[in-house]
Structure formats: structure tokens, C-alpha cells
Amino acid sequence: MGYLSGSNITNTVASTFNINVSSSNHYITYSNGDGYNDIKYIPQMTIDYTGSYSNVLIAGLGLGVIPQWFATEKNSNVTVIENNNELISTIENFGYLHENINIIEADIFTYEPSSNYDIAVMDIWFDCYNSIYYQQTGSLINKYSVSSNIVSIPLRNY
């Protein structure tokens, strides 16, 4: 797993993903495609960027591991945006999610943040074989860098 920061994003990468690199808070993470290690290192990677996690936005609920980590380890208020109602119901029924986690059923591409966040983690899967992939990634980085100090998007390194 590795990452590029705003000042280190090359023009080639920026143009590929249609990213405005004028701000230093754009971050792209990439991995070897090992989903376990991606999840394992997302929290550690975010520590490298900032020490303040009071308000966190996470796109994608998954099994709730990443939101749970921020809420319990960093005492963060976590907003999770998830578009799958069945997944939300299943995870909420387990009853283990921290009280600081607020799940909103919405699409991260159309969701309008109501507040600023210390970090926005896009823990969602993109279809990297689809040409829309690059547009989707760039649009999320550009959109959430306005309301967040850091934007982190895991990308597969193929």
C-alpha cells in the first residue's frame, strides 16, 4: 500500500483522474489488490496525515470495521454514507456499532455534506475496468476536498 499527496501527484496522474491539484489535501492511496491489507492499513495511513479526527466522513459501510476504528480508537464522530439499505439493516442488527457512528442511507456521489470533516475516507469499490472509474474517482476527490482536510481513496494498483 502506498499513497500520493497533493504536492506529489504528478500531472499525468492528476489528468488521468481529472483532479485539481492546487490544494495539498488531495490524497490517493493505492494497493496491490489485497483487500485485507487495504482495510488493515487505512487507519494507519490516516494517522500519517493528521492527529485530529473529531469529525469523520466514511463512504461505504462494509462490515463497519473502519467506522468502528475511528469511533473507538480516536473517539471520533463518524458519519457513514451507505447506499445499500439491506447492508445497513444487517450491520445495525448486530448491535456492536459505537454510539458515535451515524449511518446515512445515500449515494456518496450525490450526498451533500452538511458540515466539514477532518477526514473523508472513500472506502468503496470502484470498477477500474470501466472508463467511468477515473471520472468517479476524480469527482469524489474534488468534491470532498472542499469540505474535508484530507480525502483518502483506496485504488487498486494494476
Language-model segments: what does each one mean?
Residues 2-12, 24, 41-158:
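The AdoMet/dcAdoMet-binding core of the Class I SAM-like
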Residues 11-19:
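Charge-rich, low-hydrophobicity low-complexity segments
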Residues 17, 32-42, 91:
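Long alpha-helical, hydrophobic tracts
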Residues 20-32:
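Short polybasic amphipathic segments
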